[in-house]
């Protein structure tokens, strides 16, 4: 959505500005390295963005950075712990509507974490709670391209495609568009 694109830009512009400011403060305190003399900064680069799935699991109830959620409800099967994970924002809406019930969550699980079948959600809410595979993958490319101008290194961008279901020409087009839009790297499918 346009709102998501605007927020994406605001967030990464703010991160860039704050990281540059911090680098300037470090340069004031510790001096500029020889390679950066005259730039007023301590660091040559300040940002590289990766999906942080493992870190988000360890920290609990935080997002995996730029990575869309794979499901709104799933069982996380770790080496030492098996736990059920619910999208807490979705859970809050369901509670407000008196729909935070086992039957509803079971239906979400049966649909691979999707909520598109739930009549109790508005169309806008269904759009907000799309899973990684439900989001048009070009939208992920477009958001990555939009924020790249604020990132001085690169982003680790994952796309969710099933090569058995998506024609090779469509996959190729995603990669070409990403390259044309200045996205430096794409990973996993």
Regions found by a protein language model. Give the residues of each.
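Internal maturation/activation junctions in enzymes
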Residues: 1-52, 123-127
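Catalytic alpha/beta core of large soluble enzyme barrels
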Residues: 47-189
